[in-house]
From Swiss-Prot:
One of its GO terms (biological process) is translation. NCBIfam families: rpmD_bact. GO terms for cellular component: cytosolic large ribosomal subunit. Gene3D superfamilies: Ribosomal protein L30, ferredoxin-like fold domain. The gene is rpmD. This is Large ribosomal subunit protein uL30. Belongs to the universal ribosomal protein uL30 family. GO terms for molecular function: structural constituent of ribosome. SUPFAM superfamilies: Ribosomal protein L30p/L7e.
Amino acid sequence: MAKDTNKTVKVRLVRGLRGTQSRHRLSVRALGLNKLNDVRELKDSPQVRGLINTVHYLVKVEE
């Protein structure tokens, strides 16, 4: 059976970036999130999952 390559994941920025590490701010920007409560629908890939794991305390993930 072939893998479903169209899987996506919704990511929402739920906490502000003040007081966070610069690496984490860059990870949030790489996910395409700019302002509080921004939502992006991204392709579910290991790279995106790694960025989400880095900033798990700032974002909310909806499968």
